Amino acid sequence: MEPRAGCRLPVRVEQVVNGALVVTVSCGERSFAGILLDCTKKSGLFGLSPSTLLPLADNSSAVSCHGQAPEEGTGEVMQLETGPLHPHHKDPEKDQPPKTAVSEPPPPLIPPVPAGNLPPFPPYFEGAPFPHPLWLRNTYQQWVPQPPPRTIKRTRRRLSRNRDPGRLILSTIRLRPRQVLCEKCKSTVSPQEASPSPLNTPKPRRRLGSGPDSEHRKPEEPEDSAVIATAAPRRSKREKREEDRVAGERVPRSPVIKISYSTPQGKGEVVKIPSRVHGSVEPFCPQQSLQNGSQDSEVSRDVEPRGGGDRPPSGSSASIPKLKLTRPVPPISDLPPPKIRLKPHRLGDGEHEPLYRAELVEELNGCPRGPLVSSPALFADGSSHGLEDLSSGSSGEDDDLKRFPQGKHGRDGLAFLVDCPGRRTDCTSESVCSTDSLDELKSSGSEVTSPDTGDLSSGDSASVPSSSADTRQTVPPLTVRLHTQSVSRCVTEDGRTVAVGDIVWGKIHGFPWWPARVLDISLGQKEDGEPSWQEAKVSWFGSPTTSFLSISKLSPFSEFFKLRFNRKKKGMYRKAITEAANATQHVAPEIRELLTQFEM
């Protein structure tokens, strides 16, 4: 009889394993073997979803067992009680077991545990082999034995034997300082580092009797003097003070004057006038005295200039230098440094070169410093005895120089006189005056302009008590003469012609290339008439400011547009570019020729 759906067949239980039955059934000449599962357990077989076994749970109540699992050799047959079976099918099954049973019975497993001690998930038991990893990933709601957790091997850092575990390891690599600038640029950008006496590291307190020898020995020391100083044994402050006082009494010296020329482009030169021993030059200024606030007795101060040893700038730079007289840090806190102001002085109706005289401001913060007596003598063109004329100009972004009315020769000039009066007896280090620009130095015929106040300070020097307070020596003023000539057209070194009214690109340090219009062109000349520089006064588009730039720093707007234009800039930059482009269209060649035809 062929098996069909709905028929009932007697089966033989071969083995019982944790609620699962291994059965065999013979149907005619064929034999079938399989596993029957306990449908009351909702977990089902490994890898099968429980939903496939739910329909069989309805008929589970009709299944009953007539006996326990038969041992080997017995022929008991389990049959279902849901209906009568045909007799010809029952007799052969009882008489002899089927010969077509499982050829290889499963390996003997551990004996089944009692019903009360069954594990919660029947298909697996303690000691079962681990499933395949793919099966392990595809199964979810079943209990699957997991391998023991692996130990992750971590390499620990070796700690130093002489170091505490709680302390961090500091790197022992010694890095060299970055050399951002070369020696020439370093002395130009920061001239304080190249000065004879160190201005960046002043002493916290300086007294009246400190000597100059230590200051003058410092330039001769090597660069690693700090390392040598730390290795040498330290001396007490009293010993140093006594040595400085003894050394200061030997050689009284005049102040060191330093003039630094710097431009926004980072180029410039430094002119240093070192100190000289007193008595080498005749006194220039009349007697002056200064009372010390902490002492009753007057102390005198002898100041002498350097005569013929002045050296001019090493060469004329491409950019127009800016006259900037820097000063060191004030030496003491009890007496602030005196102030100087510049006043114009007219020599006569026929003179076209105004002279400016630097004077000490009489009172500062309400306390008088002493009698203010300026030099009665003023330098004319050829009366600068022992002092060379220094050519200088201004090249700042915000410098708007006011031109003098031109004379018959078409030349503007400026003489800058600085008196260095005595303040204390210990003036050896440096005495420099500070002016940010030449804006206040140049005026348009005004008798007295607003004073440009600079600082005049001095460092450590010797204390030289004099027998009489009336005999004192002072330093002659420092004279700077500027001779400029205004033109309407000039030719650059590379052969380009720059005229008044041209639209050009200009560069200021810290800003991108910016469009500008040339307002005026000035030629700076030395005493012998040789031009030293060419500068142009330009007005920036999109900004009310004007600047003086070197002609070599300007480039035509239209020709260099693709090279100078920055597409990333927005806002005022784009507005300035638009204004410059519109202005370029209006500057026709005939207009340019009209502007330059009145060239002198």
From Swiss-Prot:
InterPro entries documented for this protein: PWWP_dom (IPR000313)
Biased composition (Basic and acidic residues): 239-252, 298-309
Region (Disordered): 81-115, 143-171, 186-350, 366-408, 426-477
Composition bias, Low complexity: 381-395, 457-468
Compartment(s): Nucleus
Location of the PWWP domain: 500-560
PTM per Swiss-Prot/TrEMBL: Deubiquitinated by BRCC3; leading to its stabilization.
Name of the molecule in the record: PWWP domain-containing protein 2B
Organism name: Mus musculus (Mouse)
Gene name of this polypeptide: Pwwp2b
